[in-house]
């Protein structure tokens, strides 16, 4: 979706084998996810926005990549929910950067009505082939244990769907 909106994307993943898939989806380039990525990329301090799906374990590093006026949205907790020890925004965030968070549990609430989500455009992009919405794996309901095993072993390779008939 970001690429369709004209955004230049640097994707991160824990698995180098996923680079080609991410590049096919439009990522300009890929990096191996690490806690100190900001120290290893040329764009550090020049990035407009970070969508942080890893969470608290890399949040400070995500903030360190941003330019003045840049925004980081914490929207996932793949790295766990452990709090950031002694987090002090005055000392650990650059002046002029923004941190926000989004939890999908707010969809449909008065603060985030579903009518604000461009579902028709997302569906149109999927139908036109501009957005790949195919799940990586589909499981029957009686295969739910295998789905959990794959997810916990980091073998999902994308979104998984469990079908109940």
Feature-to-residue mapping (PLM):
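Short amphipathic alpha-helix with an adjacent loop that forms part of the alpha/beta core around
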Residues: 35-45
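Glycine-rich phosphate-binding loop and adjacent beta-alpha segment
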Residues: 5, 57-128, 164-165
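N-terminal Rossmann-like NAD(P) cofactor-binding module of classical short-chain dehydrogenase/reductase
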Residues: 48-51
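Mid-domain Rossmann-like dinucleotide-binding core that forms the NAD(H)/NADP(H) cofactor-binding site
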Residues: 1-35
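Glycine-rich beta-to-alpha transition loops that act as phosphate-gripper elements at the mouths
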Residues: 10-16, 53-56, 138
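C-terminal hydrophobic helical "lid"/dimerization subdomain
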Residues: 111-165
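Short, well-ordered alpha-helical microsegments
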Residues: 19, 38, 59-60
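Glycine-rich, N-terminal phosphate-binding loop of Rossmann-like dinucleotide-binding domains
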Residues: 34, 54, 76
């Amino acid at each position: 979706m970001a690429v369709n909106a004209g955004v230049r994307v640097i994707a991160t993943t824990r698995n180098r084998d996923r680079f080609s898939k991410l590049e096919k989806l439009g990522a300009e380039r890929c990096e191996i996810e690490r806690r100190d990525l900001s120290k290893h990329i040329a764009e550090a301090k020049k990035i407009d926005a970070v969508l942080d799906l890893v969470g608290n374990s890399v949040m400070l590093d995500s903030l360190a990549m941003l330019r003045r006026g840049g925004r980081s949205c914490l929207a996932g907790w793949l790295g766990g929910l452990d709090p950031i020890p002694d987090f002090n925004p005055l000392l650990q965030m650059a002046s002029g950067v923004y941190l926000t968070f989004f939890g999908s549990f707010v969809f449909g609430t008065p603060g985030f009505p579903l009518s604000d989500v461009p579902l028709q455009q997302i569906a149109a992009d999927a139908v036109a082939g501009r957005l790949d919405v195919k799940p990586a794996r589909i499981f029957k309901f009686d295969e739910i244990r295998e789905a959990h095993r794959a997810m916990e072993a980091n073998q999902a390779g994308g979104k998984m769907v469990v079908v109940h008939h």
